[in-house]
């Protein structure tokens, strides 16, 4: 079932969609700076490499993320409106929908599903270890708990805005635009093309980091795509069936398990 959408106005009365864009853009940009303490703890040379004081780095990170996410969120919401994908909970609040009620049960299930995914991924990672080239990577750096908690917001919010709200929506919209009868909703294969396509792109985006640890053998590539793609498929399904908020919560819960409980 496609998520319920409400009209997105583009003229003078466009304040609700502007509020939606502003809400998600601000949340994503704040998450982009929240990950900085974790990133610096993981790679202390980062500060030396960027060559700027921390306050300036925070401002630059926020400004860059804000501009990028504003464009991506606006595009994702606009395209998603045509195909039944979007952010129904935030949209209902923006429109002050009188009959709105928070779907606590499905949100809780999304959080549980994300936590289960976060617990399964390290187990799946162990299956790849016998096939990985060279020595195993060194033990992870001990990072303060609060830094790991903050880092989880980046995955839950910023990555979902990029991968689900924008990228998955764009892929589905392209398939729908060129392969569907006018006025017909997207078919299942179009939705799944978006889910899998966005997950693959997300996994491919992690290959440069993997290449810093191992040579890019078939096993390394498979591990990178599988571990990063499986979560994306689950989050994409939630985005399709329940809306962006459910995907955000599930991704956040998965990262809490991986980073906070798992300590990675």
Which residues make up each language-model segment?
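N-terminal juxtamembrane cytosolic/stromal segments of multi-pass membrane proteins
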Residues: 1-20, 80-99
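Alpha-helical transmembrane segments and their helix-start/interface "positive-inside/aromatic belt" motifs
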Residues: 9-27, 61-66, 97-112, 245
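Alpha-helical transmembrane segments of multi-pass membrane proteins
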Residues: 26-46, 73-81, 118-126
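Membrane-interface segments at the starts/ends of alpha-helical transmembrane spans
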Residues: 48-64, 142-152
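Alpha-helical transmembrane segments of polytopic membrane proteins
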Residues: 57-70, 220-227
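Membrane-water interface of transmembrane alpha-helices
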Residues: 72-88, 166-173
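Juxtamembrane helix-loop-helix connectors linking adjacent transmembrane helices
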Residues: 86-158, 173-185
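Transmembrane helix-loop-helix hairpins at the membrane interface
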Residues: 145-264
């Amino acid at each position: 079932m496609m998520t319920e959408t409400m009209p997105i106005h583009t003229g003078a009365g466009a304040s609700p969609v502007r509020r939606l864009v502003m809400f998600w853009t601000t949340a994503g940009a704040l998450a982009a700076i929240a990950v900085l303490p974790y990133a610096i703890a993981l790679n202390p040379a980062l500060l030396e490499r960027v060559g700027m004081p921390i306050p300036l780095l925070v401002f630059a990170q926020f400004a860059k993320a804000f501009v990028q996410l504003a464009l991506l969120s606006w595009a994702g919401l606009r395209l998603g409106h045509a195909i039944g994908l979007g952010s129904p909970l935030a949209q209902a609040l923006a429109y002050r929908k009188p009959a709105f009620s928070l779907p606590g049960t499905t949100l809780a299930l999304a959080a549980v599903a994300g936590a289960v995914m976060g617990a399964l991924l390290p187990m799946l990672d162990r299956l790849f270890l016998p096939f990985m080239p060279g020595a195993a990577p060194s033990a992870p750096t001990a990072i303060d708990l609060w830094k790991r908690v903050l880092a989880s917001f980046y995955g839950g919010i910023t990555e979902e805005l990029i991968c689900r709200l924008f990228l998955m929506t764009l892929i589905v919209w392209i398939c729908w635009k060129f392969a569907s009868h006018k006025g017909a909703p997207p078919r299942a294969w179009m939705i799944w093309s978006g889910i899998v396509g966005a997950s693959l792109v997300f996994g491919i985006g992690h290959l440069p980091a993997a290449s810093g640890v191992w040579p890019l053998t078939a096993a390394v590539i498979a591990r990178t795509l599988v571990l990063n793609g499986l979560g994306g498929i689950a989050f994409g399904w939630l985005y399709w069936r329940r809306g962006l908020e459910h995907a955000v919560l599930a991704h956040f819960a998965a990262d809490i398990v991986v980073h906070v409980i798992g300590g990675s």
